[in-house]
Amino acid sequence: MQLLLKSIFTCALFVIFVYATAQSLLKVQETEARQAYLNVTSSSSSNLSQDDGHFLSRRLRQVSHGEEGDEGAPSQMDDELEQMTKVHGEAPDAEELRECSEGLVLPLWMPQRNISVGDRLVRGFVYFVLLIYLFVGVSIIADRFMAAIEAITSIERAVVVKGPNNTKQVMHVRIWNETVANLTLMALGSSAPEILLSVIEIYAKDFESGDLGPGTIVGSAAYNLFMIIAVCMIWIPAGEVRRIRHLRVFFVTALFSVFAYVWLWLILSVFTPGVILVWEAIVTLLFFPLTVLWAYIAERRLLVYKYMDKNYRVNKRGTVVAGEHDQVEMDAEKGPKQPMVTSARGNDAEAFDEARREYITLLTELRQKYPDADLEQLEMMAQEQVLARSSKSRAFYRIQATRKMVGSGNLMRKIQERAHSDLTEVKAQLHAGDDEEADDPIRMYFEPGHYTVMENCGEFEVRVVRRGDISTYASVEYETQDGTASAGTDFVGRKGLLSFPPGVDEQRFRIEVIDDDVFEEDECFYIRLFNPSEGVKLAVPMIATVMILDDDHAGIFAFTDSVFEITESVGRFELKVMRYSGARGTVIVPYWTENDTATESKDYEGARGELVFENNESEKFIDLFILEESSYEKDVSFKVHIGEPRLAPDDELAAKIKEVEKKPVQDLTELDRILLLSKPRNGELTTAYVRIRESQEFKATVDKLVAKANVSAVLGTSSWKEQFKDALTVIPADESEFDNDDEEEEVPSCFSYVSHFVCLFWKVLFAFVPPTDICGGYVTFVVSIFVIGVITAIIGDAASYFGCALNIKDSVTAILFVALGTSIPDTFASMIAAKHDEGADNCIGNVTGSNAVNVFLGIGLAWTIAAVYHSSHGMTFNVEPGTIGFAVALFCGEALIAIMLIMFRRWHKGIGAELGGPKVSKYISAAILVFLWVFYVVICILEAYDVIRV
């Protein structure tokens, strides 16, 4: 069906073109015949005039009658020729055969007189091909211009907002308001050729009015409103709809887009017919900032708009009071009413939170889809999806469309590369502190800082490490210090010097522990580092703690702390159970988990089992597995218990204790009592709370990635190297956004290669334009608009020569050919936006806004310059209403029909949206819009050639 519509559309254009060309060439042929006939007649008249003037008139009449009889030429033409020869002595009206005038940039194809029809057709074809190539070039440089505009409008500033728990949070928001950007720089970027053509034509014609510039603007407006919206209606996938979100802004731009052409009609035909005064031109130009201001007020709900969401009633005293909020948003999606949540944090903060929630939701979905992928891979895929789904500007879709047409590939590939670089950059920032040790001074410390030894271990080894620069010699002294353990009784005191030759990063020494047979509590002593050599600093731990466990007791068992705080991304967590005050025998300690605020199988895996402490073993670990949900904010806990410890049945100490327990109390010796006291028992900390919090690294990663989720960055370039690489590389224009499962590399299609080599000249030429990263895009902005101006001037000359070669009027060339050439990229951009955007603002809202801006800025600026110039020279700026006035009036009527059709589709229960909807309704609506455009073009052409007179 889409192919059929494209074929019908192409055939309609071809028929219109053939008709206009045939009519023009017919007039050319008739005029050439008249000219030849007149030349012959004039030559005969010149020879006879010396003899008899009366004979001349009679002879002319005879020849006239003879021609009528022999050749069948109309007598009316002969009478006109005779009359004109008598009165003027010259050729017929010069308008019948237009002679081309020299252009502003493009040289004129000579000669201009005595050209055959075949020559004119060849010249017309050459100019037509040149126009197409120029349209491609201006489309490519316009994309550079749009990228610069995107870089300018995406400038951000840091603001501090309060989080849900009154925590301060720094976020970056755009300085430019979206509506203001769309109606100013974005509109200028998408319509720069039309606007500049209007201004350049005024200058090229010595500040006199022309038909090409205004005709292009009016023709482009008609094509945008009718054809682009029609194509977007049927381009929406089956079963989907797209609605305008900012309906207030759409109403403002739609109102001004119609009023703009009503205003043109007023100043052309009503106020001062045929004359544009200075005040009229200036007011036309001032309507541009007024449109932007009004749209901004509507979008921000300022002035009267802030009262439009409230209901009002009159109380008993006759006072108007505000009622309850009606909870209906004009730009809300169709569906159940939702209460409005007012937040002091502002729209930017709410948008940031929404983007963050979307990122986390995507991460959860991807975790379920790819359960074997690690967190970093999931974060990469989530960032790709966030960038792909994030809000995109008109510039993105315009550049995306052009890149596909000229073989430069899909912007989604750049998004994928950007996601990888973003994640790498964020991870590097988060771990930056881990890689800065090389710049620190030389440090020495114990590793580890805590030692637990048995009383009967004999000796144990202590390790001291050096970090930083190890290329020099360094030294440090150490000594033992008493704690609850005393030197000489529990250990052998020691003092010494540790030397670190160049290249050595650690040294070790040994401490001896003294064993005895007396039961005693656990004891500890310390080892201290001091007096480091020059250039060496002592770092923590500079004091090591040594715990001596008695080997005559089975031990006391407990957790090291009552609360353990972990992150959900830890995966496996080892919970330590300590055995102190002895480590004799094999002891079994039961353990189990219990829900608190955390839920088993959701937040953690339940565990139940027994720990077996072998003889002289002082610590064991309970393996706990934490289930990660990638929650941005999480705070839940569960309990871990240890039960009563018991000696292993086959343990030697257990057998001895059983024998002693059989004895009467009065028969127990001192050694028996000590043996009974050595039974294992629990300490105070038998229950530990494990608190699961969100991962701070994950939280920081989310914040940074969401802050970086700006598609604008992929539109710009950072270096000339990147630009020339893009210009010389053929990239496949694949339609898919991402394909994580397909590892096969795609190959560019034949169309990609052909379009690449056709556009290679433009791509290489425009690679010299400065990158957008220079001065925030402003240099690119200035250079691009200059280049667009030069190419637009050439387009103006080529379009004029094209019309002149085929004797087509400038007004027809502008409305039909130039308007189409400048609007084709916008058509493809709107199609992509319609398919991928969630709303219809980038398809419909930008059309009405662009139409209004084109008139107020394009025609207003050009006419202001011309009116001021003529006024300064004491003259008036004359503009013949003619075809422009008729086209404006016709467009206004059809525009109202189109806008009413769009609103009818939105409010109709069976459709409910401007774009998409049921198959039959969307094709009928699109057909109506296509008919409006074809009717508009045909009537304008017929009026231009006086086939119909208004």
Swiss-Prot record:
Listed result of changing residue 803 to D: Disruption in the ability to maintain electric potential upon stimulation with light
Location(s) in or outside the cell: Cell membrane; Cell projection, Rhabdomere membrane
Keywords: Antiport, Calcium, Calcium transport, Calmodulin-binding, Cell membrane, Cell projection, Glycoprotein, Ion transport, Membrane, Metal-binding, Repeat, Signal, Sodium, Sodium transport, Transmembrane, Transmembrane helix, Transport
Cytoplasmic face residues: 142-179, 238-257, 300-749, 797-813, 870-883, 945-950
Effect annotated for changing residue 584 to A: No effect on Ca(2+) binding kinetics
Glycosylation sites: 39, 47, 114, 846
InterPro entries the UniProt entry points to: CaCA, CalX-like_sf, Calx_beta, Na_Ca_Ex, Na_Ca_Ex_C-exten, NaCa_Exmemb, NCX_ion-bd_dom_sf
Side Extracellular, residues: 23-120, 201-216, 771-775, 835-848, 905-923
GO cellular component, one term: axon
Family: Belongs to the Ca(2+):cation antiporter (CaCA) (TC 2.A.19) family. SLC8 subfamily.
Function per UniProt: Na(+)/Ca(2+) antiporter that couples the energy of a Na(+) electrochemical gradient to the movement of Ca(2+) against an electrochemical gradient across a membrane, which contributes to the regulation of cytoplasmic Ca(2+) levels. Mediates Na(+)/Ca(2+) exchange in photoreceptor cells and involved in controlling Ca(2+) levels during phototransduction, affecting magnitude of the photoresponse, activation kinetics, signal amplification, response termination, and light adaptation.
Protein name according to UniProt: Sodium/calcium exchanger Calx
